[in-house]
Amino acid sequence: MPKREKIQEMFDNIAPEYDRLNHIMSLDVDKTWRKRALTQIFKQTVGEPELEAEGCGMKVLDIACGTGDFSIAIAEEMVRRAKRCHQQGTDPSRCPGHVTGLDLSSGMLEIMGKKVEAKGLRDMISYEVGDCEHLRFEDGAFDRVTVAFGVRNFENREACLKEMLRVLRLGSRASR
């Protein structure tokens, strides 16, 4: 069985317990890692006039999104920043942005869907089964591309990184 199928099967099987196990095995450090990564997602870079100062309208691809904790954290931060944008007179149609979650495991995404629904973020977060080696998105479709914990599971890291760079808008950033 190819690595991709093994990974998919493993995560489908552990999906119901994944969040609890992740917190236990990392001694809750995973929460700190997410906060640090979130800071990097919104850190502005020189030459990004396409994004408002607060990151309004940002399009983020979260690869290996799992049960969606990081995608949800990104969307919640977008909502907070959108409120500030509105106070500064930013066009509301540019706020707050969108997160697309991608994962091999339909079991993980099923749990993500329940979380997204419970948080009322269905309009801001979409998610789909997919493989980072063959992204269906157009060149330059995203302002940010991120992978929280999934790089270790990529079958072909080089192919995934090439695809991540392809779908990243020129001048934007990827993070892990």
Write out the residue ranges for each language-model feature.
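A short acidic, Gly/Pro-enriched loop at the edge of an enzyme's catalytic core
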Residues: 133-145
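Class I SAM-dependent methyltransferase SAM/SAH-binding core
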Residues: 58-134
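Conserved alpha-helix/loop element of class I SAM-dependent methyltransferases that forms part
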Residues: 28-58, 73, 77
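Class I SAM-dependent methyltransferase Rossmann-like catalytic core
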Residues: 15-29
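N-terminal, positively charged/glycine-rich alpha-helical extensions of SAM-dependent methyltransferases
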Residues: 1-19
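A short glycine-rich, Lys/Arg-flanked "PGG" loop and its adjoining helix->strand segment in the class I
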Residues: 158-173
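Short catalytic micro-motifs in class I SAM-dependent methyltransferases
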Residues: 149-150
